[in-house]
């Protein structure tokens, strides 16, 4: 199952820099492991925003929920999820 996910990050201004840096380091490691596994095949930064558009390729809604709630920055995110399916006019043979 493919999902388009927008993640907007809002780290509190009063969070100590060391704490924010540690959370961001864990977030990077977690997201890169998911990218290497193929569960998170695409991620794009939104210019001028602390946000991204991502594509997730997972087995179920529950799996996606577990991945998203496992993000170290989850508590500081607004997340919008849109399920995707192949368009009948697509010229691609795969989901990439």
UniProtKB/Swiss-Prot annotation:
SUPFAM superfamilies referenced in this protein's UniProt entry, alphabetically: Dimeric alpha+beta barrel
GO molecular function: muconolactone delta-isomerase activity
Catalyzed reaction equations: (S)-muconolactone = (4,5-dihydro-5-oxofuran-2-yl)-acetate
Cell membrane listed as a keyword: no
UniProt pathway: Aromatic compound metabolism; beta-ketoadipate pathway; 5-oxo-4,5-dihydro-2-furylacetate from catechol: step 3/3
Family matches, as Pfam families: MIase
Keywords on record: Aromatic hydrocarbons catabolism, Isomerase
NCBIfam families (UniProt xref): muco_delta
Family assignment from sequence similarity: Belongs to the muconolactone Delta-isomerase family.
The protein's assembly and partners: Homodecamer.
Entry protein name: Muconolactone Delta-isomerase 1
Organism: Acinetobacter lwoffii
């Amino acid at each position: 199952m493919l999902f388009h996910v927008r993640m907007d990050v809002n780290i509190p201004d009063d969070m100590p820099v060391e704490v924010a840096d540690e959370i961001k380091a864990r977030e990077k490691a977690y997201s890169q492991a998911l990218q290497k596994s193929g569960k998170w095949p695409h991620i794009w930064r939104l210019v001028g925003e602390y946000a991204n558009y991502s594509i997730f390729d997972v087995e179920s809604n529950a799996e996606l929920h577990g991945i998203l709630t496992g993000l170290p920055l989850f508590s500081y995110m607004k997340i919008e999820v849109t399920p995707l399916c192949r368009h009948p006019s697509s010229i691609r043979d795969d989901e990439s």
